[in-house]
Amino acid sequence: MFAEGRIPLWVVGVVAGIGAIGVLGLFFYGAYAGLGSSM
């Protein structure tokens, strides 16, 4: 699966994209929940 023991670039991009979306989603969800509970 791995080319010369290195991870393919597209795999890194997919993992990074999912991670970034997950972090941003949790951040915005936390901010929205915090604002909603404070009002």
Curated annotation (Swiss-Prot):
Protein name: Photosystem II reaction center protein J
Modified residues (N-formylmethionine): M1
Entry similarity comment: Belongs to the PsbJ family.
Residues that span the membrane, as ranges: 9-31
UniProt keyword list: Formylation, Membrane, Photosynthesis, Photosystem II, Reaction center, Thylakoid, Transmembrane, Transmembrane helix
PANTHER family from the UniProt entry: PHOTOSYSTEM II REACTION CENTER PROTEIN J (PTHR34812:SF3)
A GO biological process held by the record: photosynthesis
